């Protein structure tokens, strides 16, 4: 519940028994996520989503030993809904709460088992390229809890650049997947943009976004 998706999963001994996601189509008309609408949708969705996750897992809520929740980063209103629900659920069942950094969860989600026979385990240390809607980072992962950001965007995240470019082209939200699909069908050598020179492991997408907007403006004039 960090942004516009309400999600719940049931995990036993590292094996995922269920995973339910409810996406919010209400933001499409606005070309981006509206925080207030996202918060309201989370309030409507969170109980049905959690109930469905328990149902698919074949687990009763009384059997739960703990409840994990997203503490951030994310939209404040969305985070408050998830946190408040987790606190109430924890108190009612008398079970502990586990707060989770959702970016760390992105890194470690690849190692959640889907069956008892899945023995895939992380080989620490390793490097992770984390690219999500609002974040773009290079992370050195030393252990489950020890992670070090060694590089990141100094301006826009890759997802933000995708969505902003998609919006000016009149593509529906979210535009990233649509641009990705169209790019695979197009000519990769049709246009060339200058690549920013950033020291170290950091990177920048704002210049690339601006170059694209100028190109689009000039093409429209023609």
Model-inferred region functions:
Residues 1-73, 102, 106:
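N-terminal beta-alpha supersecondary unit
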Residues 1-2, 17-19, 122-123, 131, ...:
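A short helix-loop
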Residues 60-63, 85-102, 109-111:
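Nucleotide and nucleotide-moiety/phosphate-recognizing core
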Residues 66-68, 78, 121, 126-130:
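Short glycine-aspartate micro-motif
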Residues 69-93, 112-113:
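Short Gly/Thr/Asp-enriched flexible loops that form oxyanion-binding sites at enzyme active sites
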Residues 70, 81, 97-105, 130-131, ...:
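Active-site nucleophile and cofactor-binding loops and adjacent substrate-binding regions
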Residues 100-126:
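Conserved phosphate-binding catalytic cores of ATP/NTP-utilizing and phosphoryl-transfer enzymes
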């Amino acid at each position: 519940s960090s942004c516009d998706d309400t999600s719940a999963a049931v995990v036993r001994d590292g094996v995922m028994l269920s995973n339910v996601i409810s996406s919010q189509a209400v933001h499409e008309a606005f070309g981006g996520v509206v925080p207030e609408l996202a918060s309201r949708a989370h309030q409507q969705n969170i109980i049905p989503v959690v109930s469905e996750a328990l149902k698919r897992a074949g687990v009763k809520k009384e059997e739960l030993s703990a409840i994990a929740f997203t503490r951030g980063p994310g939209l404040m209103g969305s985070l408050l809904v998830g946190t408040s629900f987790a606190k109430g659920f924890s108190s009612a069942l008398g079970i502990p709460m586990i707060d989770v950094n959702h970016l760390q969860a992105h890194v470690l989600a690849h190692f959640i088992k889907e069956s008892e026979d899945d023995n895939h385990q992380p080989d620490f240390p390793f490097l992770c390229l984390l690219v999500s809607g609002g974040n773009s980072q290079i992370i050195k992962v030393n252990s489950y809890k020890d992670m070090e950001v060694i590089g990141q965007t100094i301006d826009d995240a890759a997802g933000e650049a995708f969505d902003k470019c998609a919006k000016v082209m009149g593509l529906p939200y979210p535009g990233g997947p649509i641009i990705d699909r169209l790019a695979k069908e197009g000519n990769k050598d049709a246009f060339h943009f200058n690549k920013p020179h950033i020291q170290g492991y950091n990177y920048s997408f704002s210049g690339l976004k601006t170059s694209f907007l100028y190109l689009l403006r000039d093409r429209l004039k023609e």
